[in-house]
Amino acid sequence: MNIKLITVGKLKEHYLKDGIAEYSKRIARFAKVELIEVPDEKTPEHASQAQNQQIMAKEGERIADKIGSRDYVIVLAIEGKQLPSETFSKKMSDITLSGYSTITFIIGGSLGLDERIKQRADMAISFGLLTLPHQLMRLVLIEQIYRAFMIQQGSPYHK
């Protein structure tokens, strides 16, 4: 199984990099992890809605280039479905049993995701209505992916 995490922008915070590296290492027992950062677009301070749409479209093109034609794609979006960790774990298991070898997770930039990427997605999930930095969501997501594997193993990690 392959887990691909496509994100917008370069992660600069060392504490987040360290956490992501740790969980990636833990997940490596179960799946190959590929972390892909696509460049973000500079957003003018008082950007119009049209400018924001153009920025998301450019970032969306870069994301689309990294999605495999046979990937199962899950986007993080505020309007996505909120799942308990156990349900998320079962969903990941069901996806692999359905014949997919790669699950691709996508986290957009500070403006969100282009609609075309959302439409390409097989599933949209949300971690709630709170607004969180997209850089922090990388760590939260990768921890939940690790937790999903631990649930599948019956590990006491998930209590």
From Swiss-Prot:
Coiled coil: none annotated. Belongs to the RNA methyltransferase RlmH family. The lineage of its organism: Bacteria, Bacillati, Bacillota, Bacilli, Lactobacillales. It comes from Leuconostoc citreum (strain KM20). This is Ribosomal RNA large subunit methyltransferase H. Disulfide bonds: none annotated. GO terms for cellular component: cytoplasm. The keyword Transmembrane helix does not apply. Homodimer. It catalyses: pseudouridine(1915) in 23S rRNA + S-adenosyl-L-methionine = N(3)-methylpseudouridine(1915) in 23S rRNA + S-adenosyl-L-homocysteine + H(+). It is found in: Cytoplasm.
